[in-house]
Amino acid sequence: YLVTESEQLESKTLPVTPLDRTPGFDQIALLKKPSHQDYDDWLFKWQSLHTQVAIDTQSTCRYTQNVIVRALTKEAPDYVAIVEEGYPDKSAMFDPMIFYDAKGDKDRMLKNIQLMMESCSGFIDFEEFPTDLIAMSQYIVKK
């Protein structure tokens, strides 16, 4: 995909060591626009309303939004955006309390999940298009 990148939260804590994996992980979300929503409304709800909610309710140390300009192959799925979320600790992959920035605080975790899901429902139709999520190793290479 050809994308326009917006780095909403740049990592200040992850080590920049070429060829070395960080102690964290990346989660990639591949987004489709709900058919009932026009593009400008979708983009506004994702980039203007949701961004800070995502940063505030998850333990991310890096958050990048990529709006897809066009697919580079005919076979590419019809995604409209790719989100990159960087987590400093790989345990966030398996522990929702860490993922939702609520280590040891169940009430905070539940509140953060609720805020996140309410925000996501403004630009994701989970019944029409389930969001594809991919967890992967994280390597930070200095730009």
Regions inferred by a protein language model and the residue ranges of each:
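Macromolecular interaction modules
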Residues: 1-143
